[in-house]
């Protein structure tokens, strides 16, 4: 089995705890202090090692990191509330993030960061590589439940965001992944398409993505999903193109929610582009990076370049990975 970490989630999760040790202090100054910075990085390593040790037979570990998203080019108000106000320590925060990335690369872990790609985009591409190309099991470690939309029979998600640890998988693969569930965690089977519908129809306040219909909430969504076919064979798949997917959802949603089809289609098409992690989205982009590559080309190039570069072969402990004894 391989493990794929959401690097930005791990970094923010650890920092949220680390920062509580310095309440009332200038966090920029704290992060500039070499000794305190190393304490923070050691805590990141401890979290990483503990997670890997929770699973057996881990072959490769990949960590993905965000860059400035292509979605801002398409939707300038993307994540408006999150990006318009920066904390005073933001520059130091990013410097330490860069240092952590360099540290992981130096240790032989595969680190993936591609211009224009968010971690979500890279998690999808790496899931295709491990799950489809290699036909190997992949466990994605993130607190972002939206990523469950990319689960397959051999790609699952481990949410370590709280004391209530959960390993998510598709319903048809639960009998396999139940043997991978670490002690103290719960196995939860979820249909990936239902996760996508949640994002597309209800939007995402944290990303400033609107819902398709005002007042249409989670309970209404559950009722809508109950009207859909239960047989996966007649449902859209990851191979479905953008318009057929939008049309499939809009046709059924407009009837159920009594929304004009054209109105529903326009909003659903927009939300699909913003939230769906699928090849049809990337194939439809006009984004080009500094090397004149499309986003999809750039991500595939990164996977091809790094897929055989994994070198770490020691124990997943602070002493072995960080290179210094625990005091």
Residue ranges and their predicted role:
Residues 19-23, 27, 77-79, 154, ...:
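Generic preference for flexible, low-structure residues
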Residues 40, 263-268, 273-327:
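Low-complexity, acidic/Ser/Thr- and charged residue-rich accessory regions of DNA metabolism proteins
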Residues 23-24, 33, 135, 243, ...:
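Short, flexible coil/linker elements and helix-boundary hinge sites characteristic
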Residues 1-105:
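Domain-level signal for Mg2+-assisted phosphodiester chemistry and nucleotide/NA-binding surfaces
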Residues 84-288:
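Extended two-metal-dependent nuclease catalytic cores across DNA- and RNA-processing enzymes
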